[in-house]
Amino acid sequence: MILADIYIPAVDANYDFMLDENVPTVQVMEEISEMISKKVKEKKPMQIMDFVLYSMDTGTLLDHNLSLYANGIHDGSRMIFV
């Protein structure tokens, strides 16, 4: 498990997440989407593949199919979810 900071422009907020770095990034995106939907009391988006997760540290788009670890994400990484 890693602790990562994720900025969500849609709600203009930063959140700290404890994430499993060994699961596919798309699974992490599902978890983020679910948490944000509960926070803003909206329905969770149906098409998670319409969203992307960027690394703020490297400026790269994360591959949905690779794990966070394989995408170079580690403890303390900063990401943007759009």
What does each of the following model-derived ranges do?
Residues M1-V82:
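Ubiquitin system architectures
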